[in-house]
Amino acid sequence: MINKNISIQINGEPFNCSEPLSLQFLLNYLDFNSERIAIEINSTLLPERLFHSTYINDQDKVEIITIVGGG
């Protein structure tokens, strides 16, 4: 089996991994609370219910938007 590195962008910054990752695994690895963020992959907004079943592909562009309350 040949291992191919996966190169993606997270908020415009390069990120490499050695195997496909679920979006939820990536969020956990980066220490994001999935209840307080919005995620776009390749300009498509994903609902939170799809975080576990969505896998990151080579050359994907991931935007992680943190939701902050204020007043």
Swiss-Prot record:
Keyword tags: Chloroplast, Plastid
Cellular component GO terms, alphabetical: chloroplast
SUPFAM superfamilies to which the protein is assigned, alphabetical: MoaD/ThiS (SSF54285)
Domain of life: Eukaryota
CDD domains per UniProt: Ubl_ThiS (cd00565)
InterPro entries in the cross-refs: Beta-grasp_dom_sf, Mopterin_synth/thiamin_S_b, Thi_S, ThiS/MoaD-like
A family per Pfam: ThiS
Chief place of localization: plastid
Localization in the cell: Plastid, Chloroplast
Family (UniProt): Belongs to the ycf40 family.
NCBIfam families associated with the record: thiS (TIGR01683)
Protein name as it appears in the record: Uncharacterized protein ycf40
Source organism per UniProt: Porphyra purpurea (Red seaweed)
Gene label: ycf40
